[in-house]
Amino acid sequence: MNDAPLPRGRHHQQGPVINATTSTAPHQPAPAAPDTAIRPALRALSLGAGVQSSALLCLSADGTLPKIDIAVFADTGWEPKKVYEHLDRLEREIAAPAGIPIVRVSSGNIRNDALDPNHRFASMPLYILNQDGKQGMTRRQCTGEYKIKPIKKKIREILGYPYPSRVPKGVFVEQWVGISTDEFHRAKDSGVQYMHNAHPLIDIGWSRADCIRYLERLGLADTPKSSCLGCPFHGNAQWRSIRDASPSEWADVVEFDAAIRQGNARANATGNPLLGQAYLHRSRVPLSEAPIDHVTAAEWAALRQETGAPDAEDLETGVVDGCSPWACRGEQPEPVRDDFGLAV
């Protein structure tokens, strides 16, 4: 769908701050103190179309939270069909009636870029089996390139200071990020002065479970996790869901998994080949052969020892909250390198 018209930067109006000091003149009210607080030019939502960010959009649309001026969805070009369908529904049924524009931004197609020898590729966190049999991972750069970068670019444009213009001090956007109380430790700032991250779900004391119940009441119980179709942080349950519910998408990820076995095309073309083999699944076997079906407790124990999974729940559920630009749950559990060579 086409991007809705963008709001120009403006300051939100709030009531004056009243000086509560007792007046020295009898029967005279204390004068209002000057309102010198620096306010955001506008409020924006980092919309991943997962549970928490969807809940924030709905809470703003129904008036429970202040109205946001814009929601920005960073499209990696390889989101599951369920995410695109859910995003369309949010725009049609929630955002548009409330007058909240949803803008879609992109830095390219992460799948195509990985297989294009002429394109710089920001690496995905692939599971590596080194030539000496040791295990490792490639460094996660995809969130910065395909999520954070296009959002920052759009915010600069909205403020009227596109790169490389300098954004004046004091000009900033209040950016809402979908972090709930059960993951408050993930809350962090944006790293740039023109975007101040806010976490309204923490402010109102909502957990992920609260968000799910709220979305269920709105008829949005099928809100998906927000992550790339072929995200290596998927758990077995997510891989099974793709395989069983969407054969075409399963064929897509199986094909991609095989295509990146020797590393990304750009690295190979420039003489920096992967010194090992890359896989999408933690087991470090081809995705078409990976043990993604439910197994017994004894099998869990054996598989956990074999794959190095910290626990069976992680292997099954994967990244619980999907991929958020400023709060990716994909912490590096194993040694990495910046390049796409040997993971040590």
Task: For every predicted segment, state its role.
Residues 2-344:
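Nucleotide-activated chemistry modules centered on ATP-dependent adenylation/adenylyltransferase
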